Amino acid sequence: MKTRKLFALLAALAFVLPAMAQGNYKNFKVSMYARAYEVDKMADQHWLDSTWTIISSQLKVDKIYLETHRDLLIVPDATLEKAKKFFASKGIETAGGITYTINEANNFETFCYSNPEHRALVQRIAEHTAKHFNEFILDDFFFTSCKEDGEIDAKGSKSWTEYRLEKMTEAGKNLVIDPAKKVNPKVKVIIKYPNWYDHFQGLGFNLDKGPKIFDGIWTGTETRDPGSAQHLQNYLSYNIIRYFNNLAPGRNGGGWVDAGGINMSMDRYAEQLHLTMLAKAPEISLFAYHQLCGIGLQSSWRAPWQDLGNTSWNYDKIVAPFKDAKGNTITPSTMAVITDRVLHQTDELMGKLGNPVGINSFKAFHSRGEAFLQNYLGMIGLPMEMLPSYPTGKKVFLLTAQAANDPDLASKIDQQLRTGNDVVVTSGLVKAAQDKLSTICELQVNDLKAMVNDFGRHGKSERDILIPQVLYYTNDSWEVVSAGRPLNGGTSGYPILHRALYSKGNYYVLTIPDDFGQLYDYPRAALKEIRRVMSQDLDVYLDAPSKVSLFLYDNKTLVVENFNDTPVEINLVTEPGIKTMTNLLENEKIQGELQAGGWRQPKENFFKVILPPHTYKAYSYK
């Protein structure tokens, strides 16, 4: 009898456990982060019940991170255990979280990691958290901006970057990881890296050593409003996941989005969620509990382009009353409903997409120069795949000023070109590493500038663009795309895309405007030629204006997304052998039109697609 009961139990578990593992979404997990301020309030059962009802009636969540400390508020043991028990009763997985700030409102005031009292408190918080959880995550602020007298003295003759990299790596191991594991040997300590990766080294985030000492990493994919403090481009929400996946393969837990940018429109918030998942993040964490239950729906989030009626996210449908599983009518009240609808819609697509592929771009650890440039390139339709090491086996790769300090820079380029492949470097890299690169081609980029708006046969820009002048020897290298003011009938012209022959390969220089945002002003035909040159490893490239991005996958699928406020007509360009594209969500087929390529270029197939504002479409091709 006992044997039969055991087998029956095992059979039941075999059925139930996969369903539990699957959660509320088919292709990823959705979690939520609760700040210490809100976790502390969870001691009040009424507050906990009422706020959870607001969220859970509109949004399906699989997991919650309960923060134990922020701004010197340490949540008591009893409150943490009560919250854990409450969410377990709802079928929600729990983990811990720590924000190491002294006063977030005071310019994100951080701990001073040479201060003995601060160090003791940092350790005590880690031990307190490990007591309650088998996993906890460090929110954005495990860095230091402290410049108190003691910290200045401790730095000595080192640069701030050198000192902080060493200090925060030491603090991570000795104050957080080791003490936590001594309290709870099962605990996994995860570090969440924020979205400002190109500035990490200056505040102590060590992307070389950090991912090796922590049990895992997480990725900040918040891009919010590009006009606000960090000026991050939409594409970063995708690009940073890919970069961190390449930093720590198999150990990047997911992406992290907050409500920032929703003031622009519902679509700006939706894009951050959507792009995070397009990068194939296994989980997304929503910051935060107080926003999801407290930020009410606002009519101003309904952008004017919603009147077109065929955008990817329909505001009116998303906020309309709906029936829950029990047949009750739910009237949406907060941003939580937008989150749920966008993620479920994205979930329907994700299972059809393979692994992301893109144009390889090397970024050296702790490098400076042309910060965040790859995100601007992503916004002009160049699919980016950033790597912490040099790409191998590629027909072409991109090097920016972030490669300037590599002592092997010229030899790596030489190797690539000798194998009959190509390299694209930016004007910023030529300026930063002019002497090294002169062994490849004697180009100069100094402080000379040019104002351009006429790209000749490649069109005109609507605004003047300030570019660095790339100087070269006549007949040693050649302009592929040129610009002047004017160029046709003008007096001067300057390279936008430049080409030099070297061994069996092509060495290209891409001119980057002083203001990276003016890449968006490059005419469509100029962008098409840049994409053609840089997309040699890819099956598809774009013929489109700027602010249209392309996402490619290794199973011959793609997503193309319009970030403009107006509709665009674009072409997906392929070699002639690709005949048909099929819409992954609507099963509509489009046929390619064979057209002549550029000067001395073979014919190509053009697949016409019309994209409404802030809208994506997905296709398979063969």
Where do the protein language model's features map onto the residues?
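Bacterial N-terminal signal peptides
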Residues: 8-18
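Bacterial N-terminal signal peptides that target proteins for export
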Residues: 1-8
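Structural motif
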Residues: 33-38, 67-70, 98-99, 139-142, ...
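Hydrophobic targeting/anchoring helices
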Residues: 62, 106-110, 126, 134, ...
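Boundary at the C-terminal end of the N-terminal hydrophobic targeting segment
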Residues: 19-23
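A conserved amphipathic helix/loop scaffold
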Residues: 375, 384, 388, 400-622
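Active-site-adjacent "subsite" loops/lids of carbohydrate-active enzymes
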Residues: 25-50, 79-134, 140, 144-149, ...
